[in-house]
Curated annotation (Swiss-Prot):
Keyword DNA-binding: yes
Gene that encodes the chain: SIGE
Species the sequence originates in: Arabidopsis thaliana (Mouse-ear cress)
Protein name: RNA polymerase sigma factor sigE, chloroplastic/mitochondrial
Signals that turn on the gene: Induced by blue light illumination (470 nm), especially after dark adaptation. Induction is mediated through both cryptochrome 1 and cryptochrome 2 at lower light intensities and mainly through cryptochrome 1 at higher light intensities.
Keywords: Chloroplast, DNA-binding, Mitochondrion, Plastid, Sigma factor, Transcription, Transcription regulation, Transit peptide
């Protein structure tokens, strides 16, 4: 399709074409004729200006011009428009240029419509090309097979050399790991032994233990017991060798002599003995509960007495004997084996420490009598008689009385009462030394007694007067006194105990003694 236009200005070009496509520019200031021809094919044709003049209103021309400006710029055709001078009509000097210019101007004004057609054709061609491309893509996509791949990739098989090297490494690693484990176990055991020697190397101070207030360490596990007794075995062997050498030499052997006897160095002998003593001290310290258990079970009557500390010390000696003589190979428990030796040591201490020597057999029978009395009391709900105890133990009555007579506690006259804290010797009165001449009149004694009672608190004085009949109305029970004073019986008993303790004060006793002696 071709376009022909005539322009009177040099800068104006038809259809927005550049100056390089202008076919002819006249040097005169007259309109020039330019001819365009796109192609010689059948689809292209030369536009010939019509002979009739077409008038187009200015408004329509402006609207069409705006449409052209709003639309996208026209794409250039694939083949550039060629200019042919031969196809252009020849012009002569006899042509009316004004008329030709007017006609061409009217044709030019119609040119935007033609351009829009061209642009629409180009755009339609582009859209068709895009549609064809999409169809080709779809057809090509349909031909391809859809393959779903797994995200987990399979490992490739290694080469033969790599497999052989890997197998060698796997075989060598367990050997190295076992060696490392042995080294770490040895190091841990050595550190544990060093800690044991550092903490328990000092011997236990048996005498200074306070069995009522001290905190006993927790009981050890069976594995810990076995490990400690294992550490004690070399020390026991060395001590046996030491005893043999001491008997043969007649003196205490040195460490070098003991080491030469068993083919060891003096340092090794010293280290073995230190480790064994530390293990022994730890076993003693962590099994002190056995001593208290035996005291509470078999010697309950001595737990609150003055002999409690002494008996606990004796039980501790029995525990040490049990630890020294214990044999782990027999698979017995230390608690079962140690109970016998602890009880035996306590009973032996009780028989040897008494002021009057009591045979060991009598002391063991006394323990059995006490146990039988306790069992019968729980069974019958009352204190058992002598015949019932004898029948339970199957002993003669004479043996029973002999044991009780020998088991009576022997107290010193200078020992103090548990409640009043007064010596027993102060309660003994020399009746033979009191004569009639040294006696005082009852009135003076009564006044002195009133003075002493008045020095007490009012309630304490009333309780003593009513309790012992000093008010002239006879002795009264705790219930009667409680009713008179409007207090409980327990409070009456407390007032009585406090008053008696105050009356036994040395100053009050001396004041009353001068009226008695």
């Amino acid at each position: 399709m071709g376009v022909v236009s005539i322009s009177s200005s040099a800068a104006r070009s038809p259809l927005g074409l550049g100056n390089d496509l202008l076919t002819h520019r006249s040097s005169l200031k007259k309109p020039s004729i330019v001819a365009f021809k796109a192609d010689d094919s059948s689809n292209s044709a030369l536009i010939i200006p019509p002979r009739e003049q077409v008038l187009i209103p200015a408004e329509k021309h402006n609207e069409k011009k705006r449409e052209v400006t709003r639309r996208k710029p026209c794409k250039t055709p694939k083949k550039p428009l060629s200019l042919e001078h031969n196809s252009a009509p020849s012009c002569s000097l006899g042509v009316d240029y004004n008329e030709a210019a007017a006609r061409l101007e009217s044709i030019y004004k119609l040119s935007p419509a033609t351009t829009t057609l061209v642009e629409d054709d180009v755009e339609d061609g582009g859209s068709k090309a895009k549609v064809s491309r999409r169809r080709k893509r779809k057809e090509s996509g349909e031909e391809k097979k859809v393959v779903v791949r797994n995200n987990v990739k399979k490992e490739k098989r290694m080469s033969l050399d790599k497999r052989i090297a890997l197998k060698r490494n796997v075989q060598e690693k367990p050997v190295v790991a076992s060696v490392d484990k042995k080294v770490t176990k040895r190091q841990q055991e050595e550190e544990k032994i060093e800690r044991l020697v550092r903490d328990y190397s000092a011997s236990n101070d048996i005498v200074s233990l306070d069995w009522k207030k001290m905190k006993i360490p927790p009981v050890l596990s069976s594995t810990e017991h076995a490990w400690l007794f294992k550490l004690m075995q070399p020390m026991k062997a060395l001590l046996e060798v030491k005893d043999v050498l001491q008997k043969s030499l007649g003196r205490e052997p040195r460490e070098a002599e003991i080491a030469g006897e068993i083919n060891m160095t003096a340092g090794e002998v010293k280290k073995k003995i230190e480790i064994g003593r530390a293990a022994r001290n730890k076993l003693i310290k962590h099994n002190l509960r056995l001593v208290l258990f035996v005291m509470n079970k078999y010697f309950h009557e001595f737990t609150n007495g003055p002999k409690f500390q002494d008996l606990c010390q004796a039980g501790m000696r029995g525990l040490i004997t049990a630890i020294d003589r214990f044999e782990p190979k027999r698979k017995f428990r230390l608690s079962t084996y140690g109970l016998f030796w602890i009880r035996h040591a306590i009973i032996r201490s009780m028989t040897t420490s008494n002021f009057t020597r009591v045979p060991f057999g009598l002391e063991s029978v006394r323990v059995e009598i006490y146990k039988a009395k306790t069992e019968l009391w729980f069974e019958m709900g009352r204190p058992p008689t002598e015949d019932e105890v004898v029948e339970r133990l199957k002993i003669t009555p004479e043996r029973y009385r002999e044991v009780l007579r020998a088991a009576k506690p022997v107290l010193s006259l200078n020992s103090k009462h548990s409640v009043t804290q007064e010596e027993f010797i102060n309660g003994i009165t020399d009746v033979d030394g009191v004569g009639a001449n040294n006696s005082r009149q009852p009135a003076l004694l009564r006044l002195a007694l009133d003075d002493v009672l008045d020095s007490l608190k009012p309630k304490e004085s009333l309780v003593i007067r009513q309790r012992y009949g000093l008010d002239g109305k006879g002795d009264r029970t705790l219930g009667e006194i409680a009713g008179n004073l409007n207090i409980s019986r327990e409070m009456v008993r407390k007032h009585e105990v406090k008053a008696l303790m105050k009356l036994k004060h040395q100053a009050r006793v001396d004041y009353l003694r001068q009226y008695i002696v």
